[in-house]
Amino acid sequence: MKNRKRKQSLYLISTVLLIIAMTLTLTACGDAEEVVEGAITVPDDYSTIQEAIDAAEDGDVIVVRPGRYTERIDFQGKNITLRSTDPADSEVVSETIIDAGGVDSVVSFRSGESENAVITGFTITGGSGNMEILEFEIEGEMREVPSLYGGGIIVLNDSSPTISSNVIKDNVAERGGGILVYASSPTIQDNTIIDNLSTGGGGGVFLADSSASLSDNEITNNSAGRSGGGIAISGEGVSPSSIDGNRISNNRAENGAAFSIFQSNPVISNNQVINNTAANIGGGFYLVSSSPEIRNNDISDNQGGPSGGGVAIYFESSPELVDNLIIGNDADAGGGISVLVDSAPQISNNTISDNRARLGGGLLIGENSTPQITGNDITENYAERNGAGIFIQESEPVLDGNSIRNNEARRDGGGIYTLLNAIVTLSNNIFENNRASQGGAIHVSEGAVLELGDPDDNTYQGNVPDDVHQE
């Protein structure tokens, strides 16, 4: 009798649990159906994605089931949502593949699509770019440039699509291996842009004459034959582009491994710019005739070749570098930052630390540049030759309120080294525990001028072998 009651109790418990499980399953299925209710489904309704787009109208949703779709797609000006079954599930994204098979761009927005044209939750691969003739300023003149643009995605003609939660990988083009944006304003967010190649500029992303928003993307392991392994920016649209909250790492290029910026003034904030390698100039940033705002970024462990391990500022550029961490970068000259050729940046409240170079471990300033350097922590930088903290030549920087500490040069100028017609204005700086063969704090070479207050309001302590060495 007891056994029978026990069996009955177990049966009732099992039945209740089964009912609960079925209820939860039905609820989950109901929620999933609700998400895609009224959607066009591929391959159920149409065998290809492009056929579904052709049949869609503004406001429609197209849901694509996992699979490899070997095709190129064009939104044709339609403000529709194209999505996988679950853009938040990385496994679904990896298994829902649009593959161009090495022909043209994978995805095209070229007909004035708005922000309501959305692509989300796909792996986009196998693109080789569209042949386009676009205009660029070259040597002061607008010229038509035929090229293969936008291996993975191409955005043209004042289009403003939303590109989110995709993996864009293994695409190639002459410009914009992963994404090419020209005269448009897309929102590009939460994507992984990886292993793309540009033989020219913009291995990951190329923005030209555009007002794009790039946020929270992983841009990694892309390559450019010339400039902008991660991101290349040329010109700008109605408003500056915004680059915020991205991780830009392990990219490679001749110049500007992470960023190459030409005649543009984007706002670049809250990014991680880490472990990028330039064969020539600018492991992290290469700026040419540009004045971007670069704020609150982590610019670390980049390699700059001859110049500018972290940031290379060239040719009349006047950026604002504010509140950044510039740490552990390496170059032949200007391990952390190089400022050259008539440039006038505002460099303030940054941590410039643990950078290495032959000349100018922390900063190198030269060729008639006039930077304002205020409130920075310039510490523990190393120079194999001169100017562990800062190397200055033929320029007129103003340094105010900086802490220049614990830098070491194997030769001269532990804190600052000045050379060849440099005129250096110093006020309210702290020079502490810097080391060199001569000029522990400051080395002033023949022909250089040091302008100090009367009395000198800089602070010197513990510099070896001396504070100021004047030739």
Regions found by a protein language model. Name each.
Residues S14-T25:
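Bacterial N-terminal signal peptides
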Residues V118-R226, A232, E236-S241, N250-N251:
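Right-handed parallel beta-helix
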Residues I40, I62, I73, I80, ...:
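Solenoid scaffold repeats with emphasis on beta-solenoid/beta-helix
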Residues D44, N79-E137, G462:
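Right-handed parallel beta-helix/beta-spiral solenoid domain characteristic of secreted/periplasmic
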Residues I53, R72-F75, D89, S105-G112, ...:
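Glycine-rich beta-solenoid repeat tracts in large extracellular/virion proteins
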Residues C29-E51, A55, R65-R68:
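Right-handed parallel beta-helix/beta-solenoid
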Residues D44-Q50, V61-T81, T85-P87, T96:
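N-terminal extracellular ligand-recognition/capping segment immediately after the signal peptide
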